[in-house]
Amino acid sequence: EMIEQAKASLDRLYTARDHYLFLLQNAKDGELGEKELALMEKVKAAREGFDEAMDDDLNTADAMGKMFELVRDANVALDENSPKQAIAAVLDALGEMAGVFGILTRKADDGDEKVKALIEARAKARAEKNWAESDRLRDEITALGYVLKDTKQGQQVTKAI
């Protein structure tokens, strides 16, 4: 049971990281609004809290807690309209913290060539409003171990853990 909990926690971190990377791909430079400025303060606090926890006799439980607080705060604050700077700050902090534990090392990408071809074929089917073919291709992508999410910015594809 504890292994399943650990796997679910790691999956949550990968999902968040991959989502932030997707947002960053489509983000534009812009001024930080009130929401983003508040998030930047939370990023700073998470980094400081993480460092304090690790300095406290390697209190890994508290340090991991700071990572999850950051993810929670970022999930509330970030969306498709967030400026690059805010998204990049979250990714940088999350990557730095995760690096201490040697996690989040799996590359975030759209997968192998077969999966990329299926994704392109599905995008074409959707453009042609061929919903049956689109659904069939989605099922095939899912069967290969990927999670596909349709967003305003396009298809977001992540490897299932």
Features from the language model and the residues they span:
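Structural preference for alpha-helix termini/caps and helix-kink/transition segments
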Residues: 1-161
